[in-house]
Amino acid sequence: MTDILNDLIKNVSENIPGYIALSVTEIESGETLVSDSVKADFDIDLASAYNLEVVNAKLKTISVLGLNEEVKDITITLTDQIHIINIAPNGGYFIYLAIDSAKANIAITKTLLNKYKADLNNAI
């Protein structure tokens, strides 16, 4: 499992333009399984903890509304960054990815992220 997580960080950080940070967090426990940031002032672990609240709020909203839907991802566009919260098909974890909006293409980023997370989806 550790190898799969490390491969995910390596592939994403080396191949997604504008990469800032990435983490993988279990939804039920809130435990961050792996995290990486290329910016010293970007606290990815703290961001992951708060993004867990975003995920739980959205899941609760869907439940309260009685929607028979699954959340695939949540995209948050900031002034200079794009944050993507990609939820696993089994709902057990989410990948949080932060990218520089001036350097990244969101469609390419999401396509590559889906490609690189395939092994993780199979392992968890």
Give the role of each language-model region.
Residues 1-124:
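Non-catalytic interaction/Regulatory regions outside core domains
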